[in-house]
A protein has these predicted regions:
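Conserved non-catalytic scaffold segment of RNase H-like nuclease domains
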Residues: 1-111, 155-159, 164
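Short coil/loop linkers at secondary-structure junctions
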Residues: 59-60, 120-122, 146, 164
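Short, surface-exposed recognition loops or helix-turn segments adjacent to catalytic cores
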Residues: 95-96, 124-131, 166-167
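Substrate-recognition/cap helix-loop segment adjacent to the acidic, metal-dependent catalytic center
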Residues: 105-129
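RecB-family 4Fe-4S metal-dependent nuclease core
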Residues: 109, 119, 138-141, 165
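Active-site catalytic microenvironments for nucleophilic, acid-base chemistry
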Residues: 113-117, 139-143, 160
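Short alpha-helix plus adjacent loop in nuclease-associated cores
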Residues: 130-148
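A structural motif
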Residues: 145-159
């Protein structure tokens, strides 16, 4: 089984307009972590970069202009190399299952990122199946098995379950 653990940090919540600022993940194949990546990305021209989003992430606008942050085109090139290393995009059965917390958002951001690079084929690499605890939490709350907490943020649930949280 091929799993792509994925997390994004963005300049807002609109996949088409918000900047993708950070793309991080782990590639796991047959229960072994085989690669990790962490890309810092310069906002694309005209993109939304909400100061509150940066504050939550502990970033500044000035930081986004540093050499640490690469263009979307450069990031796309290196990220695609990772995908191509592990997936045969022409094989319908060879896909990553994407895993993460609220991973639907991350996939939407990634899909917009691909489209800005004139690539409509993200789903040649990833399955429509995902692994995401957030929908399970919502269902278990509706069933009365889990309590309704102040919010459904990952950190809140980690604290509830006594799991160390590292942002």
């Amino acid at each position: 089984m091929k799993i792509l653990f994925l997390d994004t940090e963005t300049g807002g919540v609109n996949p088409k307009e918000s900047a993708l600022i950070q793309l991080s993940g782990i590639v796991r194949i047959d229960k072994k972590d085989v690669e990790e990546f962490n890309f810092f990305i310069k906002p694309f021209e005209g993109s939304e970069v909400n100061p509150k989003a940066l504050e939550v992430q502990g970033r500044t606008l000035e930081e986004l202009d540093s050499e640490k942050y690469k263009s979307e085109a450069e990031t796309y090139f290196y990220f695609k190399k990772i995908l191509d290393k592990y997936i045969n995009k022409y094989d319908k059965e060879d896909k990553f299952i994407v895993a993460g917390y609220n991973v639907k958002f991350d996939i939407e951001m990634l899909q917009s990122f691909f489209k800005r690079q004139n690539d409509n084929y993200l789903f040649s690499y990833i399955s429509s199946a995902t692994i995401d605890p957030l929908p399970c939490i919502g269902f278990l709350q509706l069933c009365g098995i889990l309590p309704v907490l102040e919010n459904n943020k990952l950190e809140t649930w980690c604290n509830y379950f006594g799991i160390e949280f590292q942002a």
